[in-house]
């Protein structure tokens, strides 16, 4: 699991 969104952080 990741805290950041899959690609939303870009």
From Swiss-Prot:
Keywords: Cell wall, Secreted. The keyword Secreted applies. GO terms for cellular component: extracellular region. It is found in: Secreted, Cell wall. This is Unknown protein 2.
């Amino acid at each position: 699991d990741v805290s950041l969104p899959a690609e939303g952080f870009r």
